[in-house]
Each structure stands twice: as structure tokens, then as C-alpha cells.
């Protein structure tokens, strides 16, 4: 199996919405974004699937060394072998790839966030940076496009946090800011014990409104001349925002279920967004 095939398998196996946005890219850009996404999956799985925290830290440290070595032409993993040829072509910065690893390590260091600023820092590491790297691969001609991608990544992560509140709580992680839980009278025990209430719905409506605003702010930043090149990101946005709308329409019943879109619906949204340009 070639490095590119390994990354393709990694990306397709995840069933992620991101995979659908890659379908319409030219081959070279598709290989680059697939390698980037495979890297994100590798380091994310390191934290999510490793039951021993010390081993997870060792693996993340290995990835830091591997990324640094990749920028010197010394890569050993199929993902870095697939990603390395694209570093210069798409101006992919080492600091951004390392920041993603830092974000994964944050999940080992803390399970609660005091306020929105603290949660936003986490979102920047695990999602906004990915947005910046992705936009560079898609083709960004303006600094404003990278700002758009940074904000869009933030909106994606806010959507993930809303969708996965119950699942994350069962893993011992609560990303919703402590001060906002207190503001709406919702406790950590409510989340852990899946106590759906009017207060919880109000809390989630507040979170949803903020995520919707983040999408609007992102779209307002995208320069017209880059809109066509950034269609993959817009496809992701169409899928993620539809998911957010579904969560809201379902009354925020996210404590006991994980709401998702069917593959055929994702494909339809991808095609519709691509055609509209």
C-alpha cells in the first residue's frame, strides 16, 4: 500500500463530512488534503483510542518528532511520506501542524474550560489551524481567505461540541464553558446523567446562536475571488451547518444520542454547493 493509499483509506474509513468535500478537488490538491486529514485522524485517534495517558503522551511526542523530521526530508510514517511533497507547494507551516498536536494534548491536560476564551483557545488548536492549512491547499490568494478559514474552523468545532455534549461528558470531557453552565443553571452532573431540561435547552440555544454567528462571520470574510477555489470548505460548511440546524430542530436532544446526516444527504449537499460555486 502506497502512502497516498494509506491516507485515502484513513480518510474514507472515518465516515467524516470532510471526506465529501474532497471529492471535487483536482487530484494533486485532493492528495494533499487527504494526507492532512489523515494526519489529523492519526493524532486524534492517539488520544481517543489510547486508554493509558502516558502512552498517549509518548505517541504525541513521537508525532512531534516525526513532523519536525518531515520538514528536513526525514519522514518514516505513511502519512508524513504522503504529506511531505506538498509542504512547499501549498506553504504548509510546521508551526500549524505542531499546534494541532498541542490541541490533542490539551485533551490530556484538562477536561473543563472556565470560559469562552479558554474554550476558543482549544478550538483554535484543533480546528481553526486545520482550516488555515486546508484553505492553503484549496488555493488562497488573500490573507482574508485565511481569516475566513480560521473562523470557519472555529464554527465547525462549536458545532462538534454542541453535537457531542453527551458523548463527550461520558468520556469525562465537558467543553461547554463553566461560567456559561452556571449562567443557565446547568450542572456537570446534569450532563453526565443526561438530564434534559428547559435550562439545558436554553443553554444549547445560546451555544447554537453563537455557532450560527461564527458561520456568518466566516462567510463575510471570504473574498469573492477565492470563493470558487474554497468550494471544498463551503461544502463542509453546508454539511456542518445543516447538522447544526438538525440538532436545533430536534430540540437539542444530544445527551443520549449523536445526531448525524446520512451519506446520501451529505453527498447531495456537497454536489449542490459545488454546482452553485
Where do the model's predicted regions map?
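Catalytic cores of Mg2+-dependent Asp-rich isoprenoid enzymes
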Residues: 1-157, 162, 166-277
Amino acid at each position: 500500500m502506497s502512502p497516498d493509499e494509506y491516507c485515502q483509506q484513513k480518510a474514507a474509513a472515518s465516515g467524516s463530512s470532510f471526506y465529501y468535500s474532497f471529492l471535487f478537488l483536482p487530484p494533486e490538491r485532493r492528495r494533499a488534503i487527504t494526507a492532512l486529514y489523515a494526519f489529523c485522524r492519526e493524532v486524534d485517534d492517539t488520544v481517543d483510542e489510547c486508554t493509558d495517558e502516558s502512552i498517549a503522551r509518548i505517541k504525541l511526542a513521537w508525532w512531534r518528532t516525526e513532523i519536525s523530521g518531515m520538514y528536513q526530508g526525514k519522514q518514516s510514517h505513511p502519512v508524513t511520506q504522503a504529506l511531505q511533497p506538498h509542504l512547499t507547494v501549498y506553504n504548509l507551516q510546521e508551526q500549524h501542524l505542531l499546534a494541532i498536536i498541542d490541541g490533542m494534548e490539551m485533551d490530556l491536560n484538562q477536561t473543563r474550560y472556565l470560559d469562552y476564551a479558554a474554550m476558543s483557545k482549544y478550538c483554535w488548536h484543533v480546528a481553526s489551524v486545520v482550516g488555515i492549512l486546508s484553505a492553503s491547499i484549496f488555493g488562497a490568494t488573500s490573507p482574508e481567505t485565511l481569516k475566513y478559514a480560521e473562523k470557519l474552523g472555529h464554527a465547525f468545532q462549536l458545532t462538534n461540541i454542541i453535537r457531542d455534549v453527551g458523548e463527550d461528558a461520558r468520556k469525562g470531557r465537558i467543553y461547554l464553558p463553566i461560567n456559561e453552565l452556571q449562567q443557565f443553571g446547568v450542572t456537570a452532573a446534569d450532563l453526565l446523567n443526561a438530564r434534559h431540561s428547559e435550562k439545558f435547552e436554553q443553554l444549547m440555544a445560546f451555544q447554537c446562536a453563537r455557532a450560527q454567528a461564527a458561520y456568518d462571520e466566516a462567510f463575510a470574510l471570504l473574498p469573492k475571488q477565492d470563493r470558487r477555489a474554497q468550494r471544498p470548505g463551503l461544502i463542509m460548511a453546508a454539511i456542518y451547518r445543516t447538522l447544526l440546524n438538525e440538532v436545533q430542530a430536534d430540540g437539542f436532544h444530544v445527551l443520549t444520542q449523536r445526531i448525524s446526516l446520512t451519506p446520501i444527504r451529505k453527498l447531495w449537499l456537497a454536489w449542490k454547493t459545488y454546482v452553485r460555486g
